[in-house]
Structures are given as C-alpha cells and as structure tokens.
UniProtKB/Swiss-Prot annotation:
EC number: 2.3.1.35, 2.3.1.1
Coiled-coil parts of chain: none
An example Gene Ontology CC term for this record: mitochondrial matrix
Chain positions of site Cleavage: 233-234
Signal sequence range: none
Active site as annotated: 234
Subcellular location: Mitochondrion matrix
Single Gene Ontology MF annotation: L-glutamate N-acetyltransferase activity
Name this protein carries in UniProt: Arginine biosynthesis bifunctional protein ArgJ, mitochondrial
Assigned protein family: Belongs to the ArgJ family.
The species this protein was found in: Aspergillus fumigatus (strain ATCC MYA-4609 / CBS 101355 / FGSC A1100 / Af293) (Neosartorya fumigata)
Oligomeric form and interacting partners: Heterodimer of an alpha and a beta chain.
Amino acid sequence: MVSPAQPAAAMAAFARMAKGQVRNYSAPLDMAIPASKQKYIPSSGSYPKGFLVSGTHVGVKASNTKFPDLALISSETPCSAAAVFTTNKFQAAPVQVSKKTLESRQGQGIRSVVINSGCANAVTGKGGLEDAVNMGKKVDECNGLSEPSTIVMSTGVIGQRLPISKILNKIPTAHENLASTHDAWLTTARAICTTDTFPKLLSRTFALPSSPGRTYSLAGMTKGAGMIHPNMATLLGVLCTDAPIDPSALQSLLTHAVSRSFNSISVDGDTSTNDTVAILANGAAGGAPISSPASDDYTAMQEILTSFAQSLSQLVVRDGEGATKFVTVRVQNSPDYESARLIASTIARSPLVKTALYGRDANWGRILCAIGYTQGVAPGTVVPERTSVSFKPVDGSPVLKLLVNGEPEQVDEERASVILQEEDLEIVVDLGGGEKGEQGLGGEEAVYWFCDFSHEYVTINGDYRT
C-alpha cells in the first residue's frame, strides 16, 4: 500500500497504474497482454530455414528482474543483408556502427542481429560507440568469426550508457539458447519491446515465378508504440527470409517496401534516434538468386515484401500509445505519388485530426485544413473546387460523404458517430487530379496509417522515465 506520507505524485502515478492507464516503460510488472490485443499474437508460424533466435533476460533496466530484454537473431550460414536507418541527425551509436558494418561488408556475410531494449545507447559519445561495437564483436566471437558480421540495435531511453558488462556477459547465454521454434520467435519479439503492449511477430510462406514448386518463408518482428513518425521513428524491425537475394537487389527491395510501410505510419509525429529496419536473406531454401530488377522474381518479391512490411508496420499503429483507433488515410487522384504521400502524412500527424477522431467527432474541417497547409506538394495538386473527403466504414456499407468537389454535404451526424465508434476507420481524400482530370479516374495514390490521440498518450509519456 502507498502511505499518506508519500508524495502526491507517487499517489497519482499509483492510481493511474491501478486503473491500467500506465504502460511501464520497459518490462511491465507481469508482461500481461491486454485482452483486446490478444488477437494479434500468432499461435504458430512458418519460419525461414537456417535461422535461429532467442530472447534472454539481462536486466538492462534495473527494474526489470526477469523478463527478456536481449534479442539475438542468427543464421546458420552467411546472409545478404540490407537496412534502412533513421533520418534523425542524432543517430544512435548502434545505428552508426551497423551502417559501417553493412558498408564495409557490402551487404554480404552478415550472420546475426543483436538487440537490447531498456536503453537506446543514443547521444552517449565515444563510449556508446565502443559499447555498440563490443556487442557486435561478442556475437561474432560466439559465431566463431573475426570480421564484423553482426547488426546491432538498441531501444529505450536516450542519453544513458548501456550496462555493457551485463549485456556482454549474457550474449553467450543468448547464443546457447538459440532455437527455431515458434515459442523462441515469440520470446525474441517480446525481448525488443519497451512501451509496447504486445510482441509484434508475423510470418508467411510464398513462391517465386522461377520456382513455382519451391516454398520460401519470410518472418519479421518489430517494436514500437510511441515516437513514431518514420523516416524512420522509435521502431525497430528485423525481417528474415530463406530466399536467395543478392545484396544490391535486397537493398532496393527493402527501401521500396519501407517507403510504403514503416515510413507510411504515424503515432505521434516524432522521429527517433534509433530507428532501423533490417532484412537478412540466407538462401537456405535454394533456387536461383534474385539479382535483376527486370526479373519476374524481383517483381514478385517486391510485392510480397512490401505487403508483408505493411502488415508488420500496421501492428505498430495498432499498439500506438493510448490509441483507440486504427485509421487509414487514402489520398487518391493526385498528379504524383510524392504529393499524395505528403498530404496523407500531414493528415496523419495533425493533433486536431487525431483528437477529433478520439472524441468521435466528424470534424472534417480539420482534415481539410491539414490538406490545405501541406508543404512541398506540386503546384495545382490541391484545388478546393475538385477536392472531396469521405469516411469509408469497415463494415462495407456506403461511404459517408463529407465534402464533394469543394461543396459540404449534409452530414448524417448519427451515422458518423456510429462509424467513429468502430476501432478501424478509413478516410478517403480524392483530389480529382487524375490523368483525365475527373473524379475517380487515373492519378496516383498514397496510403498512410495512423492512430488517434487520447488522454492516455499524455499520461504514458508524462510518466515515461518514472
């Protein structure tokens, strides 16, 4: 019990926690997954050949006394590898080290990814860089390698040094515990969580045109719930496949996939120092390597990887801090893709749009305002007289038109309220600027996924370091 003598702040924090409103920063007291999130936890998986994973307890954050906070993903054979990193100028030590490793190896011969949660190892000076290097070296030693062959990632509070001795001492244990089971993959996904309420893990099988009878697998895990507005935000992602893909092709495939997935989500508009999405391809399932962008296999792989990355990144939005809504914003009939993407991004970042959705208020004027102040769009993209906005219900019922060709509709507020009570919602913005200059015909389309802003978001982030 909390005694009356304790500070009022502590009493308030306890009260909020008792109401289930506070997500502990790292390693929640019981790691319990909310009932509403259980549906996103896979009960089984189809994992790529030759990959082994483990989640191990280190206690990076002192308050974490038993839950896994060190993840290790390893391939039994060398991999092609590629990654996309944060655009934040204060790039964390592991980002700098991993970039250097991939550049020096030219995306070849990578064997492992090691990740700690509980401390970001960002803005930690030369010592932080040494810590990141030593994490990679320790994994390489366990793999019997002398050259840098490990991608390093960290997530947590910025500006604090890692308890590096504790981590280095536990890496051999993590290596000994490597396994290929579904439980091992799920535990590893848990190990990278911070304010996440559930581990984010997906897997699937696929075939390629050149080998229709051969089955390949693709698996991925990600973390993130706040500081999410990538180019990249606090999110980490690791994808693994047993398909054979050359490094240069792998980088272009990942870059395309990330631009339409992890870089098309927003929780709060902040971009972190640590964001990294990496992919490893070991070719263990055999077949001809994917190398040329002109090949049918490349085209198929691009579609498969992009779709998979979208599904994985959407789990981050569904776990947005304090979120009650999962919102898709679709901007269509734009003269070019980039303009559509900028408009979708601006809507997704707008606090006024996000709070209106939380309040179940069909305040389409806020959406229109965001469209109108979007910076960087091509001239003539936004023309009020041909702009339309509508809500698309998830139940398949007719769209609710809010604005048509710049003219407001008589909105059925009761129906709008019913639509906004659902967890999922799609906002459709039609710019009417397609190739034929008519509504719904031609033009480019961009899609963004975001969540609403609730009271809980402020509570979570107000208590983040406490």
